[in-house]
């Protein structure tokens, strides 16, 4: 299945708003939040639902735990997902949990470990698999490759797809004092499954991809430039806390749609503007 149009990350806290949207073309759900049944509000949407992991730790030196792969596979089957995805990151090492996504050293040794873990995960899933670029608040001193080279090598060796997080491209470029457009074009854009976009903010001189703030205008401008050449990837909004009033969330969805040249999905809700 080829994804298209505008979607949103499904979260229980905003499920009532999502239920009134004018047919988002897809949703994404956090795999670890799903148990043995589909939440009724999610099932009622009647749209494709992507299974998205946050705890596989693909970039760890240890093999991905089989129980976590099995849970992702069961969730993808339960949801009828067309696709499953996870981050190029590690979240644990030596049995210790970091509690958040950490960047992987961009080295050939790390690529070998990632390829093993991604291949193991891919082979254990009933659906295609995609990996996502993360926002990194630091780089490792022994990095050997650019982010574009790193991602391209991983994807070429595993054959998986890319979840292109446009906000993370912006975050990394800003924090590394690089040009976001140049960095975006260094990624393996021919392997995109779908795109993420989210908000963030500056703290202590660093841009943080918070998912709890509005999308900054430069991120929307990067999206506009990316889609201006005729690209029409599926795009979804991530929001993971500090949920705004319904009208603000609808306005943000409209801003994404307008920036990417996509159809709006906010008409006819009880909160919609006249």
Q: What spans do the regions from the language model cover?
A:
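Boundary/entry segment of secreted carbohydrate-active catalytic domains
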Residues: 1-20
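Acidic-and-aromatic substrate-binding clefts and catalytic sites of carbohydrate-active enzymes
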Residues: 13-17, 29-41, 57-67, 137-145, ...
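Acidic (Asp/Glu)-rich catalytic clusters
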Residues: 18-22, 35-51, 64-82, 121-124, ...
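C-terminal helical cap(s) of enzyme catalytic domains, especially alpha/beta-barrels
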Residues: 243-273
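Acidic/histidine-rich catalytic cores of soluble enzymes
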Residues: 125-206
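Gly/Pro-rich active-site loop or hairpin
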Residues: 63, 101-105, 111, 173-232
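Active-site acidic/histidine proton-transfer and metal-coordination neighborhood
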Residues: 68-162
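Hydrophobic faces of well-ordered beta-strands that scaffold small-molecule active sites
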Residues: 4-10, 25-29, 49-52, 84-86, ...
């Amino acid at each position: 299945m080829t994804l298209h149009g505008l979607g949103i990350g499904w979260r229980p806290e905003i499920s009532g708003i999502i239920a009134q949207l004018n047919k988002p073309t897809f949703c994404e759900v956090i795999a670890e939040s799903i148990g043995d049944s589909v939440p009724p509000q999610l099932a009622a949407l009647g749209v494709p639902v992507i299974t998205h992991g946050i705890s596989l730790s693909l970039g760890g030196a240890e093999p991905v735990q089989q129980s976590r792969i099995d849970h992702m596979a069961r969730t993808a089957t339960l949801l009828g997902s067309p696709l499953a995805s996870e981050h190029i990151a590690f979240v644990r090492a030596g049995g210790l949990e970091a509690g958040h996504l950490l960047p992987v050293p961009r080295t050939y040794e790390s690529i070998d470990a990632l390829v093993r873990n991604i291949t193991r995960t891919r082979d254990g899933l009933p659906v295609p698999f995609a990996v996502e670029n993360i926002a990194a608040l630091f780089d490792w001193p022994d990095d050997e490759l650019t982010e574009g080279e790193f991602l391209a090598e991983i994807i070429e060796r595993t054959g998986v797809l890319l979840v292109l997080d446009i906000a993370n491209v912006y975050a990394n470029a800003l924090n590394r004092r690089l040009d976001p457009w140049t960095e975006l074009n260094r990624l393996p854009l021919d392997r995109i499954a779908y795109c993420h976009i989210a908000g963030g903010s500056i703290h202590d001189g660093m841009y943080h991809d918070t998912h709890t703030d509005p999308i900054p205008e430069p991120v929307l401008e990067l999206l506009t430039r990316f889609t201006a050449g005729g690209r029409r990837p599926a795009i979804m909004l991530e929001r993971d806390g500090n949920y705004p009033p319904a009208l603000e969330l609808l306005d943000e969805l409209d801003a994404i749609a307008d920036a990417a040249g996509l159809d709006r999905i906010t008409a006819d809700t009880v909160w919609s503007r006249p």
